[in-house]
Amino acid sequence: MTVLRSMKDFSSMNITASILLFVTAIAAAVIANSPAASVYQEFLSHELHFRIGGFNLLSHAGHNLTMIEFINDGLMTIFFLMVGLEIKRELLVGELSSFRKAALPFIAACGGMVVPVVIYSMVCAPGTEGGQGLAIPMATDIAFSLGVLSLLGKRVPLSLKIFLTAFAVVDDIGGILVIAIFYSSHVAYEYLLWAALLYVLLYFIGKKGATNKIFFLVVGVVIWYLFLQSGIHSTISGVILAFVIPAKPQLNVGTYIERIRRIISTFPEMGANNIVLTNQQIAKLKEVESASDRVISPLQSLEDNLHGAVNYLVLPLFAFVNAGVMFSGEGEVIGGVTLAVALGLLAGKFLGIYSFTWLAVKSGLTPMPLGMNWKNISGVALLGGIGFTVSLFIANLSFGSAHPVLLNQAKLGVLSGTVMAGILGYLVLHWVLPKRR
């Protein structure tokens, strides 16, 4: 029941967040092609600074971060921190915690990463300017895809939601590795050394029982700055930070229950005035609050705290500054990169996830989970083509300001591929899932 309830809560949040993300992306595209386009571009290139004496936190290579750089390299680190926390949780106690659980989604995710890259390379050959975007169609947007799946409500088997979540998490791991390995340059190892020392410090402090999330986040900001200067993409700092945040609570559940029972048994009874609590009652309630805080691990607590900020602030801002596709202007609006990305997300993801899942089950390597069948897997495989967030992120890393025409084509490919995959995935699942009685 706990798993089912948490999936329901998560799905409800994802529906709202997905709608907000979609609306924000549409707004960005409309503004980018309106008379206000120049204002939009000025907003993206507006320089920011955060000075402490003569030190500017928001600077890199001698210049201030622009708004789009701050959102992509700064705020998106919060998103990747949350992704890292989700990955760590899944590896410890979730669907990736054992070979039996992880095998099918891992194999499906591998197919969902390999085949899109192959299809992309067939359209835009490696070694060409367009070939730099090979990794763009690899990603699956967890929140967006689960949001679409959740529109089907109780008709969706829990196993199907878990399968989609698990292979999307593996996709994220793949995307993070690609960013770390292929989109880093001119590494300044002295900055990385200082960052590594701070990670080690946080790890041992966590082992000693420290649970103050603010402390971990403040040190995380310092590490983020060191990564920003190092040449390794700064968002990776958030992922690594997640793995040094303690996953073990200060109180185990058994001790917590005993403590709460003891507090309740000694809770002062209400007097004649039953509106205002007595000081003794307030003290007991604070004991309950303190115990409740200590039974939730820093990892779970921080993940819960970040969901709202990421879904309703960070990702909408990211969509707004990155989804402003130009439908007119210099160069081809629709080109080879557009086709490569869209086909990679729509056809590549479907073929990769479905075929690798089929091979894994038919070979006897892993059983088909209860509640899943080849029809509903086909729908979820299509939803895997909802790349959006990480795909747009990798598109910016692939082409950036050096190739604005190709970047615009890539963005159009991501948006069109994501929309088509979402619509087709929803329609297929609507047809094949059991009708609500």
Swiss-Prot record:
Compartments where found: Cell inner membrane
GO molecular function: sodium:proton antiporter activity
Keyword Transport carried by entry: yes
Pfam families: Na_H_antiport_1
Its membrane topology: Multi-pass membrane protein
Keywords, alphabetical: Antiport, Cell inner membrane, Cell membrane, Ion transport, Membrane, Sodium, Sodium transport, Transmembrane, Transmembrane helix, Transport
GO BP, sorted A to Z: regulation of pH
GO CC aspect terms: plasma membrane
Gene3D superfamilies, alphabetized: Na+/H+ antiporter like domain
Catalytic activity annotation: Na(+)(in) + 2 H(+)(out) = Na(+)(out) + 2 H(+)(in)
Main localization category: membrane
Sequence intervals crossing the membrane: 12-32, 65-85, 103-123, 133-153, 162-182, 186-206, 214-234, 308-328, 333-353, 377-397, 412-432
Family indicated by similarity: Belongs to the NhaA Na(+)/H(+) (TC 2.A.33) antiporter family.
Its job: Na(+)/H(+) antiporter that extrudes sodium in exchange for external protons.
Protein name per its UniProtKB record: Na(+)/H(+) antiporter NhaA
Organism of this sequence: Bacteroides fragilis (strain ATCC 25285 / DSM 2151 / CCUG 4856 / JCM 11019 / LMG 10263 / NCTC 9343 / Onslow / VPI 2553 / EN-2)
